[in-house]
From Swiss-Prot:
GO terms for cellular component: cytosol. It comes from Corynebacterium urealyticum (strain ATCC 43042 / DSM 7109). Catalyzes the condensation of carbamoyl phosphate and aspartate to form carbamoyl aspartate and inorganic phosphate, the committed step in the de novo pyrimidine nucleotide biosynthesis pathway. Pathway: Pyrimidine metabolism; UMP biosynthesis via de novo pathway; (S)-dihydroorotate from bicarbonate: step 2/3. The lineage of its organism: Bacteria, Bacillati, Actinomycetota, Actinomycetes, Mycobacteriales. The keyword Methyltransferase does not apply. This is Aspartate carbamoyltransferase catalytic subunit. Pfam families: OTCace (PF00185), OTCace_N (PF02729).
Length: 314
């Protein structure tokens, strides 16, 4: 694996390899007072974020630093991008400085692929490109779900909300299908993309009908920043029809889990108390995100050996 641009680039075995590696890193860090491994000592990772981020950016930085890499953050608002520098020139500048990996988030779909086409031997990791792909989010979601419920084959995962603008929904649908899960999208017709029937998922507009059979429910934020028109009458009506209320939460099986990629809009797509319920695994997703991103950096920059084979005390 040279880059990580899309879930569709990975085979099921490669997906499972990353998830297994993430679990090995979690085990390697368990009980350590100082969370530091020498795995990527001497490697340099640049994060290039052209959109705001909390979880993805912080967990990539943590992942790199816990493996002793030098991690340098570049934000569009404080770089030469503000002076008109192109994405190509910025990426080539960082490569010339000595980047071993570029972690990219960009509002344009295909931006990470564009950089990968000319950057040579520097690894490119897509941390979200427009409404196209968010492969590391799908990998951490699957890792979290497997830790909670075991093998994903046959699990019914219901993904609810703004599917149209969601790179998370696209990446999760591809990954979950690859691992044999059954995926249902629930959304108003205005928030479903054209051609969604070809994604290998079921589509429903009735959340109440899907909840009783769900093994996991993933709530998505309405991405108002990507909307230019009225996709639903009001926030109140959206929450009434598609929000995970306390009453709807009670419809779930006892062992079902509630997920959210964040940031959550409490009171919109998820009830305040449901967001903090015992079976809501949002914080477990964040924790898994660090382990998964460690695994990805490791496989791209080292490869060929498992974390357990390369681990020594720092």
């Amino acid at each position: 694996m040279k880059n990580l641009l899309s879930i569709s680039d990975l085979t099921p075995n490669e997906i499972l390899s990353i998830m297994d590696e993430a679990d090995r890193f979690a085990e390697a860090l368990k009980g350590r007072e100082v969370k530091k491994l020498p795995t990527l000592r001497g490697r340099t990772v640049f994060t290039m974020f052209y959109e705001n981020s909390t979880r993805t950016r912080a967990s990539f930085e943590t992942a790199g630093k816990w493996m002793s890499a030098d991690v340098i953050n570049i934000s569009a608002s404080s770089s030469s991008v503000k002076k008109g520098e192109s994405l190509r020139d910025t990426a080539l500048t960082l490569k010339s400085i000595g980047a071993d990996a570029l972690v990219m988030r960009h509002p344009s779909s295909g931006a990470a692929q564009h950089v990968a086409n000319f950057i040579g031997d520097t690894a490119v990791i897509n941390a979200g490109d427009g409404s196209n792909q968010h492969p590391t989010q799908a990998l951490l979601d699957a890792t979290t779900l497997r830790r909670q419920r075991g093998d994903l084959s046959g699990q019914h995962v219901v993904i609810v909300g703004d599917i149209l603008h969601s790179r998370v929904a696209r990446s999760n649908a591809q990954l979950l299908n690859a691992l044999g899960a059954d995926v249902t999208f629930v959304a108003p017709p205005t928030l479903l993309p054209i051609g969604v029937e070809n994604w290998g998922v079921r589509v429903s507009h009735d959340l109440d009908a899907e909840l009783p059979s769900a093994d996991a429910v993933m709530m998505l934020r309405v991405q108002a920043e990507r909307m230019n028109g009225g996709f639903f009458p009001s926030h109140r009506e959206y929450a009434t029809r598609y929000g995970l209320s306390k009453a709807r939460h009670a419809m779930l099986k006892p062992d079902a889990v509630v997920m959210h990629p964040g940031p959550m809009l409490r009171g919109m797509e998820i009830n305040y108390s449901v967001a903090d319920a015992p079976n809501t695994v949002v914080l477990q997703q964040v924790t898994a995100g660090v382990h998964v991103r460690m695994a990805i950096l490791f496989q791209l920059l080292i490869g060929g050996h498992s974390a357990s084979e390369t681990e020594t005390d720092a």
